[in-house]
């Protein structure tokens, strides 16, 4: 889905398309990438959960859901604090603790997303493309102001962000900055790396053909 022109990497932004269509294409790629990122750890978690319960006799309560329908989040706090996976929660909070000594609770939020940016940057170093830390820093870093804005809204109005408006706000904010994050991984070579599903025929060929047809349709608009 990415385009070339970047050494060993690609980009989700097709410069040959008008800006609105170009951004629409990039956003769709970001959405599909997010669902893939959701599906892979979910599958791995399930593959561990089933034998742990059926064979080892562990209590299902020991294996709570890895995700809680993240697409239903009605605020950024809801998305990151509960609905997205919490595998690295303690690492992020520990990393945010130093800033809390200066900025209080806001420092924990800011520091946690800074740590997240660093960890995702480290994963990019395993790829062969153009690695740019600033994309992770801005992409994940901007989640903190969004959450702090929700807290400020609650303090001013006494109402929490939620409902349909909250859902729209959450999805727009995630997609705007998510584009930057996915672009960073695309430039680092994520879309060109070998994965377990590269030989998953005929599904792989079908997805590739659909992506090509979609690009042709976008250029025909």
Region roles according to the model:
Residues 2-30, 102-103, 121-138, 152-161, ...:
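Membrane-lumen (extracellular) interface motif
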Residues 1-77, 81, 102:
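Membrane-helix and juxtamembrane interface regions of eukaryotic multi-pass membrane proteins
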Residues 53-124, 160-221:
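Membrane-interfacial catalytic/cofactor-binding modules of polytopic membrane enzymes
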Residues 22-45, 105-113, 131-143, 161-175:
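Transmembrane alpha-helices of multi-pass eukaryotic membrane proteins
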Residues 141-150, 195-200:
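Alpha-helical transmembrane segments and their membrane-interface exit regions
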Residues 39-54, 148, 152, 176-184:
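Transmembrane alpha-helical segments that form the membrane-embedded catalytic/substrate-channel core
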